[in-house]
């Protein structure tokens, strides 16, 4: 099950403009965690975002990440899709952030460790 699924609405409306999917791991995230959240992203895209990946942001928050996660992230994170009909626009989604958390002096500190796609 999705740990966190949030929706952002256009100001003063009930129209959804973005969805945020978050997977939380108290320890180290494994490569399978990326697969897990990408399944959630695909499901949200189909069920809520009308096939528009641009409406979705995703994030994994973990205490650390398994060795080799950078390379695996680059291999699997991108989603290719088509938008519109006249003209058709080919798009690419890769809006998955990897955040590492630590506790410093009783405060939770987040560091963005998302690998660049190059």
Where does each model-flagged region fall?
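Charged, terminal alpha-helix-loop-beta segments
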Residues: 1-118
């Amino acid at each position: 099950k999705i740990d966190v699924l949030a929706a952002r609405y256009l100001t003063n409306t009930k129209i959804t403009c973005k969805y945020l999917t978050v997977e939380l791991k108290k320890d180290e995230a494994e490569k399978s965690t990326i697969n897990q959240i990408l399944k959630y992203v695909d499901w949200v895209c189909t069920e809520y975002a009308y096939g528009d990946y641009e409406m979705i942001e995703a994030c994994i928050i973990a205490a650390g990440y398994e060795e080799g996660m950078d390379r695996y992230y680059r291999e699997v994170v991108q989603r290719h899709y088509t938008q519109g009909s006249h003209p058709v626009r080919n798009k690419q989604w890769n809006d998955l952030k990897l955040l590492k958390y630590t506790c410093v002096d009783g405060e939770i500190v987040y560091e963005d460790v998302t690998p660049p796609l190059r």
